[in-house]
């Protein structure tokens, strides 16, 4: 599992960003507050929640651990 990514933000298109880490670009879905806090061309650290499915490998990125923890709590709620 990927827990954290640190690299340069090379592309932003709400709600996704692409963060480059040693030549590999990771596409990360972000909530609006996180999207607004990362700057194009600057380094960023994102705390990751990874979802692996048969047809997809999704990365959800958050500016801090607390946002990620809240997201994980919401996933446990029935119907969400």
Please report, for each region that a protein language model flagged, where it lies by residue.
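Long, highly charged, low-complexity intrinsically disordered interaction regions
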Residues: 2, 6, 10-80
């Amino acid at each position: 599992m990927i827990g954290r990514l640190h690299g340069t933000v090379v592309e932003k298109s709400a709600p996704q960003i692409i963060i480059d880490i040693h030549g590999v670009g990771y596409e990360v879905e972000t909530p609006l507050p996180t999207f607004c806090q990362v700057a194009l061309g600057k380094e960023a650290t994102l705390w990751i929640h990874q979802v692996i499915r048969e047809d997809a490998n999704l990365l959800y990125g958050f500016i801090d651990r607390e946002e990620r923890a809240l997201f994980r709590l919401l996933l446990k709620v029935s119907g969400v």
